[in-house]
């Protein structure tokens, strides 16, 4: 659903940020 997709996007963004920081 929408909430699920939103959570997925948040997780992906978090992962991307971590990769950039590392």
Swiss-Prot record:
Keywords: Gamma-carboxyglutamic acid, Ion channel impairing toxin, Ionotropic glutamate receptor inhibitor, Neurotoxin, Postsynaptic neurotoxin, Secreted, Toxin. One of its GO terms (cellular component) is host cell postsynaptic membrane. One of its GO terms (molecular function) is toxin activity. The keyword Secreted applies. Expressed by the venom duct. Its main location: secreted. It is found in: Secreted. Signal peptide: none annotated. The mature peptide does not contain cysteine residue. This is Conantokin-Oc. It comes from Conus ochroleucus (Perfect cone).
